[in-house]
Amino acid sequence: MANKYFSSVLKSLLLLLHLVFLSKQHVDSASIVKFLPGFEGPLPFELETGYIGIGEEEEVQLFYYFIKSERNPKEDPLILWLTGGPGCSSISGLLFENGPLTMKLDVYNGTLPSLVSTTYSWTKTSSMIFLDQPVGTGFSYSRTQQFNKPSDSGEAKRIHEFLQKWLGKHQEFSSNPFYVAGDSYSGLVVPATVQEISKGNYECCNPPINLQGYVLGNPLTDYAIDSNSRIPFAHGMALISDELYESLKKTCKGEYTNVHPRNTQCLKFIEEFNKCTNRILQQLILDPLCETETPDCYIYRYLLTTYWANDATVREALQINKESIGEWVRCYRTIPYDNDIKSSMPYHVNNSISGYRSLIYSGDHDLEVPYLGTQAWIRSLNYSIIDDWRPWMIKNQIAGYTRTYANKMTFATIKGGGHTIEFKPEEASIMFQRWINGQPL
């Protein structure tokens, strides 16, 4: 009887140890993915997916997609891509903006949506990490309920920790030139992350990261400057009349966001402005505002991606932990989060003093974060201009306009572009390749 009891206890202990081992094995796990459901044949590039544990107990598990450069991964730059939101999966970058795959826009018929290769991937000349952050975004999750609520400044620290651990497990990339990139809301997080990495390079006891600079597209940078640029932008794009614009300027005096409740005249004209623009697609004012998700609407790809990412065979191929999350959503709009950085301009200044390169680009038909606001905050930094406003060309056609500053900052517009580069991926790719290779746009 005693032997039976001892045997039972021993089996239970062994099972417990096995489960603990599996749990520890999953932390910082990584898998090479050679085939993806929906894509015909083997992948024509090297894809790795995995989790990196963050925090003292590694309670936060951040999921990433890593794609090696198709040119020379031993020497090419390493780019960390952060999608905006906060709470939007980095799959938005991978499948819609600058990755080697995208969704095939077929009408959904109940079967798994298809993936096809792109011609504009940034991985042609750079290795890229697409990171799902903050926790709760994409396939990233927490193993417990005990973790600090994500915030802008907190994410800069978590991302830095992620990079230290990731590079510790991928030491062959530790000497590659490293850049942080992102768009939209990442305009607040990326500059803070760059500063955090820079500071960490001078502290004990981790190897320094070969940080060279950062890239930002239509970046939310300063709430006041960016939001107050929408009305001048709308006027310049003929969305509102001269008379309404003059009335807005006169009564609101440049403050269109935090209007005093007693300023009824300003509020009245802002209501008129909203009536003129509420049926405009803010991300790209040239495109129709879709009523339904149909294949001719740009958001249809988001629907297809949701079906794809929630398919069991896809999750198995990506090696997603079954206990991580329930339904995958592209953007977790109600994610618990503290927006504690109201302006990232001080971070830009500090990063500039530290000598880092930066490329700031704007799709010039974005009403959400208009290029006028981006130009305004760059202008307020009072950097000397070394290459003044000029067109940049693709095949003898104007693709946008650019200006270069003495602090290694390059600003560029993408003609006809929107809030993200999914609207002009080919042009954005050429712009990026020139900049990352040290060539003038």
From Swiss-Prot:
Annotated glycosylation sites = N109, N350, N382
Biological role? Probable carboxypeptidase.
Q: Where in the cell is it found?
A: Secreted
Q: Matching InterPro entries, A to Z?
A: AB_hydrolase_fold (IPR029058), Peptidase_S10 (IPR001563)
User: Enzyme group, top EC level?
Assistant: hydrolase
Q: Name one GO biological process term.
A: proteolysis
Instruction: Reply yes or no: does the keyword RNA-binding apply.
Output: no
Source organism per UniProt: Arabidopsis thaliana (Mouse-ear cress)
Q: Name any one GO molecular function.
A: serine-type carboxypeptidase activity
* Family, as annotated: Belongs to the peptidase S10 family.
Q: What is the lineage of its organism?
A: Eukaryota, Viridiplantae, Streptophyta, Embryophyta, Tracheophyta
Signal sequence residues: 1-29
Q: Which Enzyme Commission number(s) are on file for it?
A: 3.4.16.-
Which organs or tissues contain this protein? Expressed in seedlings and roots.
Q: What Pfam families would the database entry show?
A: Peptidase_S10
The reply to whether Disulfide bond figures as a keyword in the UniProt entry is yes
Gene Ontology cellular-component terms listed: extracellular region
Its name, as the record gives it, is: Serine carboxypeptidase-like 2
Q: What are the cysteine partners in each disulfide bond?
A: C88-C331, C252-C266, C290-C297
Primary location: secreted
> According to its UniProt record, which residues of this chain constitute the active site?
S184, D366, H419
Which keywords does this chain's UniProt record carry?
Answer: Carboxypeptidase, Disulfide bond, Glycoprotein, Hydrolase, Protease, Secreted, Signal
